[in-house]
């Protein structure tokens, strides 16, 4: 090994880090300097010994796999939630108390264990779902590996090694790339084998066209798109062959940096706005539960702890462990009542229903919380290529020669895809093409190596998209003499095939970057041999001496015609059209008898590309076309809808500035005549802006062109720091880090890479930007419905807490046991709450500005309303309990038919002193087929005997909550204007909940488990009489709400318009 090689190894060993583009800018050095730096020659490549040494330094050429989170840690993370911790504590305490449960607890046998077991089951299911989601979260990194090349052709020890595993490449390796190859590492182009080399790197950079590569070095500060002498791992060679030198491998490649950025973004994922609100609610709930439990405990201390005062000091303490345990159980019941156990399940169900609705609109949600987050999206950062545009090149204008010198004809071409049936040519002489138009069609069809195929109802290009667009144009032009009507089932390119049959192609003059044109020689059916040329308009025009007029006649190309063509070209370029010119001539005399044979003397001229310019001279110019990556038809209206909905649209693309600006003006991001100098920046220009956040706060649209992955990620990060809720769309590898970092990552389903899809929260099945806007509307509707059922469930829980608190405060026996409350929270409340998710959306839902992510889920007014409703629930449930014990009738309803004994309210409130009452006796009473008697212990009337009163309390609670679900149909709208049948699912859900309640009432085994008994008709009338007033109360509150809405919302509206600095 030479001294230079020894120095290199020594240097690398000292640094112990790979040489990468940060330490050696290979793109800014000439080929000789690169070979010298990596101590290699392109003729011999690296030696086997050198490869082994570099493997030890650089490792394998593959992306790192991050260490997965252990299953134990994943399980623990599922309990990192306030509500879950409260539930877990309640379950543990309930389980312990079940062992000490006695007669005073009111529960028997299995009933005592139902509550903790059900809570544990809820927690287990919740943990399983959470772990499943976590283990599926990092597939983006695996998908990234799939786009890496598997094999490479390498020069080692002076010998060409085919199919070497790409992971064995090291910096300094000499690699040969051929058309169709996937680039295995970041490499410096050191020699071109073909006359030209083009690489499709749009998935990495966002460019809409394949990029020509060269061996010439570029500026050291060039961005990815500007590194014309570099090819990058994961991109594809679409034209030409070359020799390259590996400069970076594995995690040091551009795709490796994307991998690192995805990992970094995954570590900074934040909770959704709803999750944050629920966590805040859980923390507040914890404090409230703690305070109320402590208060209940203090209120009832007198029942299990008493003392006498002797000489002013407390003496002779008496403590009852059974009663202490009993009141502790009441405190636990209070906790169970306060926690909306069914809320997580109902939220998940509502979000799942939302995903189904969105799927019907072609928005496939991968992560459930994204459904709700969409509703508060304030900024949509959209990629241009493939998202706002079709990513399918299409001809939009055709310019042909006129009937005389100095005249041009212009035709607008419709269509935005590779489907030949998509659009037509305006004012086109179908079947009556003149000679000039026929020649344009002939050149576009034959001087062309692309193909268009139909696959799964989609038309896709094979080869260069620009050439595929030309073939689609030929199909729209039709064929002369009525042959365009000829049937050819399944032939997508019918006209192109017919032209190819008439004009047999015998030689190809490949495109190169010097002359910027491609030519073909054809043996025409007319007996002549022609040279057909297409290329950059200026270059083709420069080599032309004549023009062809409408009737096919030739005229000398004068200066006026030349200037006219160039002016038309400039006008089209201002519209960001890429223009291609067409010309033809008779073949040079040397090729007059050429038939494509290698033995022909003229064939030698075709082997040397330097001859092509002279062959393609003295041309006859026939016309030119303007192509572009056209915007999607629906995008302009979708952006207008975003503006109406208060959502800002920012376009972030890797494409060049002029093209991006033209598209943005066309789709409505900018007005046609708007000054956008302060709104349109390149990625590098934005990074140099001093106050970046202030730039991003500008109202209206913004554009960032030539943006690299790091720029996209930085823009998303800054927007999130500024309090925006960001939806980021994209389809390429370059979009993946920003998709992962954004609040909502939206990937394209058709054109999107697997990397982008796996990094996203939502996939658009139709690749349509307007689908995002529809999904935002659906997200807002879902959020409104979620507010309805969250408030409904919380008001129910407030009612349960009020019921238990009043019971404890009044000193009467416990009205409802924990297992009954658990049943109500989980089962009875579930169907109505879920059905509220089907509430129809407001008609003006997309005409309102987005809610702020920190907007309160429950305002002070809403809390007051539900405190009032909750207090009524508590009064009603406790009241019906007292009524059964103390009244033989209520509002004309006879309650004495079961034969139960009446007691005074004072006796009920001091039931713990029953054993000291003289002559206290009670009669037996019936409940269904059961008879309850208390001859042996009359005081059991307040424990075992409370079963009927407890059933009435539970039934009133269920009935009130069913009627209260009707109140939740609208926040302030009366049931008169929004009747129950606007949501038939709610009526069905109420029937289901009542049905479930009847099941536990009238099925003996279940009635025993829940500690309840059947009710008579009169008792049901009492339940309804006590329950129905909840509708009237809430109607009054809604009326007050409507009357004061202006006062309550005007300050809020002003505050939302003020951005926090």
From Swiss-Prot:
Enzyme Commission number(s): 7.2.2.10
GO biological process per UniProt: calcium ion transport; response to manganese ion
GO molecular function: ATP binding; ATP hydrolysis activity; metal ion binding; P-type calcium transporter activity
GO cellular component: endoplasmic reticulum; endoplasmic reticulum membrane; extracellular region; plant-type vacuole
Binding site residues for Mg(2+): 731, 735
Pfam families the UniProt entry points to: Cation_ATPase, Cation_ATPase_C, Cation_ATPase_N, E1-E2_ATPase, Hydrolase
Subcellular location: Endoplasmic reticulum membrane
SMART domains (UniProt xref): Cation_ATPase_N
Major localization class: endoplasmic reticulum
Active site feature: 383
Keyword Calcium: yes
Binding site for Ca(2+) 2: 336-337, 339, 341, 825, 829
Top-tier EC class: translocase
Keywords on record: ATP-binding, Calcium, Calcium transport, Endoplasmic reticulum, Ion transport, Magnesium, Manganese, Membrane, Metal-binding, Nucleotide-binding, Translocase, Transmembrane, Transmembrane helix, Transport
Topology relative to the membrane: Multi-pass membrane protein
Residues involved in Ca(2+) 1 binding: 797, 800, 828-829, 961
Positions in the Cytoplasmic compartment: 1-70, 136-278, 346-786, 838-857, 971-983, 1039-1061
Transmembrane annotation, as ranges: 71-91, 116-135, 279-298, 328-345, 787-806, 817-837, 858-880, 951-970, 984-1002, 1018-1038
Stored Gene3D superfamilies: Calcium-transporting ATPase, cytoplasmic domain N (3.40.1110.10), Calcium-transporting ATPase, cytoplasmic transduction domain A (2.70.150.10), Calcium-transporting ATPase, transmembrane domain (1.20.1110.10), HAD superfamily/HAD-like (3.40.50.1000)
Protein family per UniProt: Belongs to the cation transport ATPase (P-type) (TC 3.A.3) family. Type IIA subfamily.
NCBIfam families reported for this sequence: ATPase_P-type (TIGR01494)
Name of this chain's protein: Calcium-transporting ATPase 1, endoplasmic reticulum-type
Gene responsible for this protein: ECA1
């Amino acid at each position: 090994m030479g001294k230079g090689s020894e120095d290199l190894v020594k240097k690398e060993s000292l640094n112990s880090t790979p040489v990468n583009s940060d330490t050696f800018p290979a793109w800014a050095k000439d080929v000789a300097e690169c070979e010298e730096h990596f101590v290699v020659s392109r003729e011999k490549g690296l030696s086997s010994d050198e490869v082994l040494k570099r493997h030890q330094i650089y490792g394998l050429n593959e992306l790192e796999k991050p260490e997965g989170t252990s299953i134990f840690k994943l399980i623990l993370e599922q309990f990192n939630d306030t509500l879950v911790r409260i539930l877990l504590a309640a379950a543990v305490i309930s389980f312990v108390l079940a062992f000490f449960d006695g007669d005073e607890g009111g529960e028997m046998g299995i009933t005592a264990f139902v509550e903790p077991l059900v809570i544990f089951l809820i927690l287990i299911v919740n943990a399983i779902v959470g772990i499943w989601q976590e283990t599926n979260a990092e597939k983006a990194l695996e998908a990234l590996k799939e786009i890496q090349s598997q094999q490479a052709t390498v020069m080692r020890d002076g010998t060409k090694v085919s199919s070497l595993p790409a992971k064995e490449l090291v910096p300094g390796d000499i690699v040969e790339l051929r058309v169709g190859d996937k680039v295995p590492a970041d490499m410096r182009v050191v020699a071109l084998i073909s006359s030209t080399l083009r690489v499709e790197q749009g998935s990495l950079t966002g460019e809409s066209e394949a990029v020509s590569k060269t061996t010439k070095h570029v500026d050291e500060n060039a961005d990815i798109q500007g590194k014309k002498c570099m090819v990058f791992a994961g991109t594809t060679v679409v034209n030409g062959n070359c020799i390259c030198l590996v400069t970076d491998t594995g995690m040091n490649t551009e795709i490796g940096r994307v991998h690192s950025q995805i990992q970094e973004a995954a570590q900074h994922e934040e909770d959704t706005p709803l999750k944050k609100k629920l966590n805040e609610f859980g923390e507040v709930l914890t404090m409230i539960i703690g305070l109320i439990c402590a208060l209940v405990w203090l209120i009832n201390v007198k029942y299990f702890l008493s003392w006498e005062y002797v000489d002013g000091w407390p003496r002779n303490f008496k403590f009852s462990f059974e009663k202490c345990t009993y009141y502790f159980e009441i405190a636990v019941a209070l906790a169970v009542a306060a926690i909306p156990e069914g809320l997580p399940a109902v939220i998940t169900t509502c979000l799942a229903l939302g995903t189904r609705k969105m799927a019907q609109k072609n928005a496939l949600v991968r992560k459930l919380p994204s459904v709700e987050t969409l509703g508060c999206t304030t900024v949509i950062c959209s990629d241009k290529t493939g998202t706002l545009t079709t990513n399918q090149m299409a001809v939009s204008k055709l310019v042909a020669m006129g009937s005389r010198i100095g005249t041009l004809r212009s035709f607008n071409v419709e269509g935005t895809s590779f489907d030949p049936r998509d659009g037509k040519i305006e004012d086109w002489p179908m079947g009556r093409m003149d000679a000039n138009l026929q020649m344009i069609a002939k050149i576009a069809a034959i001087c062309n190596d692309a193909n268009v195929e139909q696959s799964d109802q989609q038309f896709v290009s094979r080869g260069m998209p620009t050439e595929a667009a030309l073939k689609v144009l030929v199909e729209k032009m039709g064929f002369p003499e009525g042959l365009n009507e000829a049937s050819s089932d399944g032939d997508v390119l019918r006209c192109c095939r017919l032209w190819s049959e008439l004009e047999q192609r015998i030689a190809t003059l490949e495109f190169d970057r010097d002359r910027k044109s491609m030519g073909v020689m054809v043996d025409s059916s007319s007996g002549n041999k022609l040279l057909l040329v297409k290329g950059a308009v200026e270059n083709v025009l420069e080599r032309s001496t004549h023009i062809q007029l409408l009737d096919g006649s030739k005229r000398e190309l004068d200066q006026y015609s030349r200037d006219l063509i160039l002016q038309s070209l400039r006008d089209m370029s201002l519209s960001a059209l890429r223009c291609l010119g067409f010309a033809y001539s008779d073949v040079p005399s040397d090729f007059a008898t050429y038939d494509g044979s290698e033995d022909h003397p003229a064939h030698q001229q075709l082997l040397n590309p330097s001859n092509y310019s002279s062959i393609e001279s003295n041309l006859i110019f026939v016309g030119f076309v303007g192509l572009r990556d056209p915007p999607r038809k629906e995008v302009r209206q979708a952006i207008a809808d975003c503006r109406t909905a208060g959502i800002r649209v920012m376009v972030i693309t890797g494409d060049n500035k002029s093209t991006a600006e033209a598209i943005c003006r066309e789709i409505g991001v900018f007005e046609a005549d708007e000054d956008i100098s302060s709104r349109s920046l390149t990625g590098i220009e934005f990074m140099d802006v001093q106050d970046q956040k202030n730039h991003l706060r500008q109202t209206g649209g913004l554009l960032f062109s030539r943006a690299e992955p790091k720029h996209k990620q930085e823009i998303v990060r800054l927007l999130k720091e500024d309090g925006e809720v960001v939806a980021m769309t994209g389809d390429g590898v370059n979009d993946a880090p920003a998709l992962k970092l954004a609040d909502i990552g939206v990937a394209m389903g058709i054109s999107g890479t697997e990397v982008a899809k796996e990094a996203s929260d939502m996939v658009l099945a139709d690749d349509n930007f307007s689908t995002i806007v529809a999904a935002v509307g659906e997200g807002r509707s879902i959020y409104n419905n979620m507010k309805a059922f969250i408030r409904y469930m919380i008001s129910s829980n407030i009612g349960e807490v009020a019921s238990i608190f009043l019971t404890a405060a009044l000193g009467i026996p416990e009205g409802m046991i924990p297992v009954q409350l658990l049943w109500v929270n989980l089962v009875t409340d579930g169907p109505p709450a879920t059905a509220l998710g089907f509430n129809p959306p407001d008609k003006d839902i997309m005409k309102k500005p987005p809610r702020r992510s920190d907007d309160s889920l429950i305002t002070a007014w809403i809390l007051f309303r539900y405190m009032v409703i909750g207090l009524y629930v508590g009064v009603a449930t406790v009241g019906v309990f007292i009524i059964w014990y103390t009244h033989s009738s209520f509002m004309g309803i006879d309650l004495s038919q079961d034969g139960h004994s009446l007691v005074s309210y004072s006796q009920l409130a001091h039931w713990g002193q029953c054993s000291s009452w003289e002559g206290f006796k009670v009669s037996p009473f019936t409940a269904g087929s059961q008879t309850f008697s208390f001859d042996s212990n009359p005081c059991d009337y307040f424990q075992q005997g409370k079963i009927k009163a407890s059933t009435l309390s539970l039934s009133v609670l269920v009935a009130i909550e069913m009627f209260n679900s009707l109140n939740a149909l609208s926040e302030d709208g009366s049931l008169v204007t929004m009747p129950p049948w606007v949501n038939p699912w709610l009526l069905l859900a109420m029937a289901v909940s009542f049905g479930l309640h009847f099941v536990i009432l009238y099925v003996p085994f279940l009635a025993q488990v829940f500690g309840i008994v059947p009710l008579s008709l009169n008792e049901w009338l009492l339940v309804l009489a006590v329950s129905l007033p909840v509708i009237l109360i809430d109607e009054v509150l809604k009326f007050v709400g409507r009357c004061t809405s202006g006062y309550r919302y005007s300050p809020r509206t002003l505050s939302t318009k003020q951005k926090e600095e």
